[in-house]
Amino acid sequence: MIKTRLLILITAIAGLFFYSCGYKFAGSGELPASVQKVTVLVLENKTAESGIENIITNDIIYEFTRHGKTVAKKDEADAFLYGTVETASDVAISRSSTITSLERRVVVVISLKLKSKDGNIIWTGSNISDDQAFTVLSDKLATENEMRKAIEILSKRLAEKVYNKLTDNF
């Protein structure tokens, strides 16, 4: 009985501590400048990787809707999220010889801005990056498919980073 009360008391104190210091999970805040409805524009692609801008844009839209934020049409939005895929590069991370790679890592860097309807920049996120390893296969087409899968995986993490940075009120 005493142990139960002590456990309840400790839990209550810990809860009050986290509540009082403003602790919250990443991405659980609100969008800046009281933005309620956002239009996510297709990112500009400055890389040689075709279609990467659509993959990342779709994942950002999904991340917003997953958290209950309204993704609106241009004429209904309070703000516009737009930006560029700056780089998409891959490097060898393990080799079987000086010429042959066994595994590579793709790194994608994006930069974004959130602009209000009246044209003011509300938020800027520069050089947001993520990476993902992929296996190099003997068939070039199969290796390209592995890289594409890696881009799809890291795109989801990039979208989470973008959302968390946008809703982080620190």
Model-derived features: where do they sit?
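Residues embedded in well-ordered secondary-structure elements
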Residues: I10, G29, A72, I99-S101
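Bacterial N-terminal signal peptides
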Residues: I8-S20
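Soluble non-cytosolic domains of exported or imported proteins
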Residues: T47-N58, S101, R105, L141-R157
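A charged, solvent-exposed segment within the mature domains of Sec-exported extracytoplasmic proteins
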Residues: S129-F170
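A structural "domain/chain start" motif
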Residues: I2, F18-Y62, R66-K69, K73, ...
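Bacterial N-terminal signal peptides that target proteins for export
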Residues: M1-I8
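Surface-exposed short loop/turn segments
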Residues: H67-G68, F80-N127, D131-E144
